């Protein structure tokens, strides 16, 4: 499409070269959305926009989730809050993308007519063009594709953490879980070629990253498109050959396709972390059948046994849905039993949310809210107890942490920084008097001194250790700080030197006094 630019518009663009337009990307949902949001930010920056600092941006992009009903409410609530700002500033633009946009393509502009652009999961790369077209034509642009336009990982990226990165190995899903709307929104599975994935990882490492997380709706089915059933385990082993890559994680696998070659690759590849997220969803075989999950509780528990045999210190997390249609008290008790046997480090528990367009939405015996709530509270109480007990076992252990730019809510009060252990447990730690303060991306070895359900603490006590290993990732963080404000800024802000361009609601690392 060719646009004719008037002299007035040309002058307007020249003004913008002096004062660039600002943007913000607000992200809801899963890690795949975080990955896509980083691409949206990269596209906007390549188009000349800069991230907003402290006030409403000229361009606000919502990258949405459609898994839960409250995602709809959150989006429309936030759009409503922006309406006065849009009315006061006609040049402001609002874009809505992601899974909810793919699903509600015909609804968003009706419910929020002040939105300028609606785009889907398959055409992230079109965002700058759609924004410019909406501005030029002075009318909203709706563009939803039914198949992938460009693989998102090939798009420009503005990463929020120079020390780690998300790497998508596939998009879409071939499973047909009755509660899930994602396959209808992201399509059938499409796999990237191994060489492209490894090249992206190598580029991340060369930019300073020491950790990557491999992403897919079902990572262990990777290779189905090119007929290699062991492609994922081979990919993990290939990651082990990349010099400078210290930590490899992945999410999420599916129990039905989780094979022993993957467990062996995890155990035998030095930089694959002792962490596994394995979605259970329900401990009831009847409910699993109704969910169309294609495994049963005995297979699930068998996977955990095999993982713990080969990786004894593995921390295993899960997803669980409470209140699926037709779930009886007996079914729910089966879930509690599997949770008790599994000893998850943590669990992401959800109350079943009826999603129009999914087979489960039409099932009989939808449960009353009060029943679901009561079961949910029993499940979370059990898992919180297990998490606290499993974390208590870490007290006295020496663990290596990668320092993160996010910190705990009480960081300013406690003077603690935060990091992730190899098994992904969150640890808040204090720097001993006289020791050097680490940067995000540096690695510290500490002794765990306290434990709670959701985090660990490492404070300087007699007999405890504190060892700092400065890393390339920390150097990259310093460089990003210098590029943003002229000089490195100690341990403050996000990886790119200021407010995150991709908003996740994460706290920033505190400023510690000189030691």
Swiss-Prot record:
Keywords: 4Fe-4S, Cytoplasm, Iron, Iron-sulfur, Metal-binding, S-adenosyl-L-methionine, Transferase, tRNA processing. InterPro entries: Elp3/MiaA/NifB-like_rSAM, Methylthiotransferase, Methylthiotransferase_CS, Methylthiotransferase_N, Methylthiotransferase_N_sf, MiaB_methiolase, rSAM, rSAM_horseshoe. It holds the Pfam family Radical_SAM. It catalyses: N(6)-dimethylallyladenosine(37) in tRNA + (sulfur carrier)-SH + AH2 + 2 S-adenosyl-L-methionine = 2-methylsulfanyl-N(6)-dimethylallyladenosine(37) in tRNA + (sulfur carrier)-H + 5'-deoxyadenosine + L-methionine + A + S-adenosyl-L-homocysteine + 2 H(+). Residues 159-389 form the Radical SAM core domain. [4Fe-4S] cluster 1 binds at residues 30, 65, 99. Residues 21-136 form the MTTase N-terminal domain. Binds 2 [4Fe-4S] clusters. One cluster is coordinated with 3 cysteines and an exchangeable S-adenosyl-L-methionine. The keyword Zinc-finger does not apply. SUPFAM superfamilies: Radical SAM enzymes (SSF102114). [4Fe-4S] cluster 2 binds at residues 173, 177, 180. Residues 392-462 form the TRAM domain. Its main location: cytoplasm. Monomer. Catalyzes the methylthiolation of N6-(dimethylallyl)adenosine (i(6)A), leading to the formation of 2-methylthio-N6-(dimethylallyl)adenosine (ms(2)i(6)A) at position 37 in tRNAs that read codons beginning with uridine. Belongs to the methylthiotransferase family. MiaB subfamily. This is tRNA-2-methylthio-N(6)-dimethylallyladenosine synthase. The lineage of its organism: Bacteria, Bacillati, Actinomycetota, Actinomycetes, Micrococcales.
């Amino acid at each position: 499409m060719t646009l004719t630019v008037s002299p007035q518009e040309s002058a307007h663009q020249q003004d913008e070269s002096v004062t660039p337009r600002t943007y913000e990307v607000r992200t809801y949902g899963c890690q795949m959305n975080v990955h896509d949001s980083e691409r949206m930010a990269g596209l906007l920056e390549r188009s000349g926009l800069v991230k907003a600092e402290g006030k409403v941006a000229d361009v606000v992009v919502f990258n949405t989730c459609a898994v839960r009903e409250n995602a709809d409410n959150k989006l429309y609530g936030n759009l409503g809050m922006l309406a006065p700002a849009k009315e006061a500033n006609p040049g402001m633009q609002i874009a809505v993308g992601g899974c909810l946009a793919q699903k509600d393509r015909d609804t968003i502009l009706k419910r929020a007519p002040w939105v300028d652009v609606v785009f889907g999961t398959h055409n992230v790369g079109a965002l700058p063009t759609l924004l410019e077209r909406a501005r030029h034509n002075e009318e909203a642009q709706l563009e939803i594709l039914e198949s992938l336009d460009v693989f998102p990982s090939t798009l420009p990226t503005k990463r929020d953490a120079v020390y780690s990165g998300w790497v998508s190995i596939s998009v879409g899903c071939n499973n047909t879980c009755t509660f899930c709307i994602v396959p209808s929104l992201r399509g059938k599975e499409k796999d990237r070629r191994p060489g492209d994935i490894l090249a992206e990882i190598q580029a991340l490492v060369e930019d300073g990253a020491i950790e990557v997380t491999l992403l897919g709706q079902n990572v262990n089915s990777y290779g189905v498109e090119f007929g290699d059933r062991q492609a994922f385990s081979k990919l993990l082993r290939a990651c082990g050959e990349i010099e400078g890559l210290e930590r490899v994680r992945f999410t999420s696998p599916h129990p039905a396709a989780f094979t022993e070659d993957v467990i062996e690759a995890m155990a035998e590849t030095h930089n694959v972390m002792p962490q596994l997220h394995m979605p259970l969803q329900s401990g009831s075989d009847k409910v699993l059948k109704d969910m169309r999950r294609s495994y049963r509780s005995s297979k699930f528990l068998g996977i955990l046994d095999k993982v713990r045999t080969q990786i004894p210190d593995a921390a295993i997390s899960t997803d669980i849905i409470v209140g699926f249609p037709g779930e009886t008290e007996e079914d729910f008790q089966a879930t509690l039993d599997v949770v008790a046997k599994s000893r998850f480090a943590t669990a992401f528990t959800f109350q079943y949310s009826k999603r129009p367009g999914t087979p489960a939405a039409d099932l009989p015996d939808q449960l009353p809210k009060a029943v679901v709530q009561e079961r949910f509270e029993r499940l979370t109480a059990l898992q919180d107890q297990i998490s606290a007990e499993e974390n208590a076992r870490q007290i006295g252990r020496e663990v290596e942490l990668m320092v993160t730019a996010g910190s705990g809510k009480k960081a300013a009060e406690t003077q603690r920084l935060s990091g992730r252990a190899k098994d992904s447990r969150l640890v808040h730690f204090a720097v001993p008097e006289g020791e050097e303060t680490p940067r995000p991306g540096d690695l510290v070895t500490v002794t765990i001194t306290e434990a709670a359900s959701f985090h660990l603490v490492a404070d300087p006590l007699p007999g405890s250790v504190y060892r700092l290993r400065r890393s390339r990732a920390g150097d990259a963080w310093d460089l990003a700080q210098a590029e943003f404000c002229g000089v490195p800024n100690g341990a403050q802000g996000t990886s790119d030197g200021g407010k995150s361009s991709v908003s996740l609601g994460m706290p920033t690392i505190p400023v510690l006094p000189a030691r």
